[in-house]
């Protein structure tokens, strides 16, 4: 709860994170034991705890807090240290999720996705720290540009620009996904 939600309202995770982490480490332990048995002919025992598993998964917030001397802020669907990052509404009402992780992606977003090279040199957005300081204005500009496109068109542009992205689906849309049927 201390890292999820917004500054005003914490939020629980959508699933049992500690249980999922522990299951992942158990699966890895079984694979390691099978590999060891294949190589040496000997079995092996291992232990996994919920606490140890979630401790590993909490390493980023822990290292950030230790290194920065302050905890990560709860940022909702935003990222604590990257902008732009999160869900953005397109002109057809669909929601697209993406995050800019480096300078190449920032330039590609401005030029290839938004079609506005002036944003790349705008002093408010030139570096990631500046984009973080002016995040509200940047997100507004992005959604204004996206208003001219459907979610599918935005996704195509992001894909062509090699920017990690996803369409934000409802549970109903997920259940209709062709890979499920």
Where are these regions (language model features)?
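A glycine-rich dinucleotide-binding beta-alpha-beta segment and adjacent secondary-structure elements
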Residues: 160-181
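Aromatic-enriched alpha-helical interface/lid elements that frame and gate functional surfaces
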Residues: 84-161, 165
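Active-site-adjacent "lid/gating" segments in soluble enzymes
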Residues: 1-100, 108
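Histidine- and/or cysteine-centered catalytic micro-motif in compact active-site loops
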Residues: 51, 101-103, 168-171
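Short, solvent-exposed polar/charged micro-motifs at secondary-structure junctions
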Residues: 56-60, 129-137, 175-180
């Amino acid at each position: 709860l201390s890292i999820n939600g917004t500054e005003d309202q914490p939020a629980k995770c959508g699933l049992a994170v500690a249980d999922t982490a522990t299951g992942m480490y158990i699966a890895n332990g079984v694979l390691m034991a099978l590999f060891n048995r294949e190589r040496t002919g000997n079995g092996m025992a291992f232990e996994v705890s919920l606490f140890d598993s979630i401790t590993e998964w909490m390493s980023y917030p822990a290292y950030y807090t230790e290194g920065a001397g302050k905890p990560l802020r709860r940022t909702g669907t935003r990222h604590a240290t990257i902008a732009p990052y999160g869900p953005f509404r397109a002109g057809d009402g669909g929601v697209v999720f993406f995050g800019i992780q480096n300078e190449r992606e920032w330039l590609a977003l401005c030029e290839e996705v938004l079609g506005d090279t002036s944003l790349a040199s705008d002093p408010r957005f030139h570096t990631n720290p500046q984009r973080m300081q002016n995040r509200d204005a940047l997100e507004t500009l992005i959604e204004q540009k996206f208003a001219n496109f459907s979610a599918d068109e935005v996704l195509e542009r992001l894909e062509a620009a090699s920017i990690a992205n996803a369409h934000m689906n409802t549970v109903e849309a997920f259940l209709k996904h062709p890979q499920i049927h």
